[in-house]
Amino acid sequence: MPRKPSPINLICLLLMAILMLPVVNVEAGHTDQPAIKCISAPVEDCVENMLRSMTLEEKLGQMFMIGIQGTDVDEESLFMLHQYHIGGIILFDRNMKTQEQVKQLNAHLQAQAGEKLPLFIAVDEEGGVVARMKEQLPPPPSAQEIGETGTPDNARLWARKTARALRNIGFNVNLAPVADIGTGRGRSFGNTPVVVTDFVRSAASGYEQEDFIYCLKHFPGLGRGKVDTHLDSTVVDASRRELMKWDVMPFQSIIREKTPADYFIMVNHATYSRLEKNVPASISKVIQTDFLRGKLEYQGVIITDDIAMGALSKYYAPSDVALRAVRAGADIILSCHVYQNGADAYHRLLRAVEKGEISEERINASLRRILRVKLTHLGKTT
């Protein structure tokens, strides 16, 4: 195991100098996390001040969301958090035993952020088969079950209930709702774009009412995919026009109506052969930059699906995936299970910037989007 690093104090000192306010707790009754404070400054001014205060290494760390292995913060997870300045954590059943234990774990994780930027702490709590700690935290109904009620407002009510339950044990991001059309295993609200759009829009409103970060997935839609991308690659043979008229409609509706700092969009690992041959969406500039940012004018955070899924890991090294994903337009690399994958990806991005393969301004563009979300939801500006 690599040697344990010394504590990282630079970002704490810089933020104290810039913001000149003590860290405060979030709303009473919620798990403590560092709060970002600005002195009567607009969010954009705070973003630029923070960006100027950060080293390249700290910026790159904010672009990673990783999984940890234990039920508490241990030496390995501490090393990852501090050595690589990690900006986000995702938890799975392996990390979660009881509600109180999860609350303490998340508090311990946030404590590692000190006076710097708070962590995104995420979970997949879609409902139905995709829900964590089911015996301790009763899961929401599946998206299919909610859709079958025929009442979109039920999606809003369940989103609010889910957000409250997750916040109470220290989470601040839910990687839901699924905006795919006709996905199997009960993960989709329906089989038509109109139905899915109505329910996704309602779910988004529920999360927003609770001031909770949510994530639309899996752009540009996995409903046509025939192979589970956890296992291997799948090819979608649809034109951009066909995607726009069907698969993309729920995403486009949210992009048009919602504030980009309120949510992420997750890109999937399917290959859309009529948009870009042999290139999965998660590493495709055509799909992320030209389509999602260009055509649809999305200005928020793009997060990849897990870079260790079979659709990528059978064909690419994790470090290559990270480099290609950032070049394509992604802001956050999701690495759920293996510490070394995250470390290798971080080092590859660092070398790429140092060698001029990626500009630091490209990294700054991602950081601006990430910081806007953290300033909006994980701290209070005054």
Annotate each PLM feature:
Residues 61-68, 87-91, 119-125, 173-176, ...:
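Hydrophobic faces of well-ordered beta-strands that scaffold small-molecule active sites
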Residues 110-138, 158-178, 196, 204-221:
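Glycine-rich, aromatic-flanked loop segments that form ligand/cofactor-binding clefts
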Residues 12-22:
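Bacterial N-terminal signal peptides
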Residues 70-82, 154-165, 246-251, 316-322:
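Short, acidic/polar
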Residues 2-11:
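Bacterial N-terminal signal peptides that target proteins for export
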Residues 63-73, 143-157, 232-246, 308-316:
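Active-site mouth loops of central-metabolism enzymes
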Residues 28-121, 125-135, 372:
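N-terminal hydrophobic targeting/anchoring segments and the immediately downstream early-domain regions
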Residues 55, 96-113, 129-131, 191, ...:
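Second-shell residues forming the walls of enzyme active-site clefts
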